[in-house]
UniProtKB/Swiss-Prot annotation:
It comes from Schizosaccharomyces pombe (strain 972 / ATCC 24843) (Fission yeast). This is Inner kinetochore subunit mal2. It holds the Pfam family CENP-O. Keywords: Cell cycle, Cell division, Centromere, Chromosome, Kinetochore, Mitosis, Nucleus. It is found in: Nucleus; Chromosome, Centromere, Kinetochore; Chromosome, Centromere. It comes from the Eukaryota.
Amino acid sequence: MDDEEGNATLIDEISVLEARRDVLLDELKSLDNATLSDLVQKPELSKNLSVNNEFLKETPLNQPALHYDRLSGISFFQPNDPEELSRKTLLVKNKKTGAIETAPSIPLLGVRFDIMLNPVNIGFTNLSENPISSASGMDEELEGGNRFDVPYYIIFRVFHDSFALYKYTIPSFLNIQEWADEYLTGKNPERFRIFLWKVDKLLTAYICRKNALLQINKSLTIDGTNISANLSCTHLVIQIPKVIQATLVCSSESTRVVKSRIYQYSDENWKRDHRLELSLLDNKRWVNILVSHLTAPESHASL
């Protein structure tokens, strides 16, 4: 009799788990083609995914200024689980009952980040005033509409009270693991939205810096010009023989110049240009200022 009752209890628990799994799968399917704004408009989705609805509505404050304008988007999808078949054949021990049973399914949630490749505005009041676009023919490129960079993806494992990184295509030099440890663990599962927000801004800042570097490179046509940068485009070096030697350091979370060291060649000597350095620091128009300065006739008259 005890064995029959034990079996009945085990069957009931398995049924409850299977029902819970089906509910989670249905919820993930409903997220297909959704956007982050949809989560705000559908509190039942955020609640079932253990995301606090009030936190979703809250606009993050006290964040560093992001000196760029971009059109970007975050969308959700349900990816296929490559481990689904292996899980069906995997047996595990139930910690509560001690029974051996099939490994439970852990749902996946996919997030796609789409970032504009070209800036709508990167320090210029309008495109017609942009000396970079005029010098590089970028106005013609923008006439046909803007383009997107390759999309970036993050696949999450969805647990009862938290999320976990499973796979992602974010470049390794953009470290998101620290944010994942802070915002996705069981202690702070309601902060899923802020994690996505921070990753989106990190990617947008990186693409903006990369594009700014490309624009500067296209604009400077002086013979002997050498422009280099690290992978994250936060450390930029510009060298023009007998004209300028400049080292610029940008914030990893924006396009702001946070440190600079610039030497100008004058009277057969290299002299540090403190005025130009100060004009670039924390100035969203620093690309404009730098290119205008370097393309001015007096800047390379010594050549």
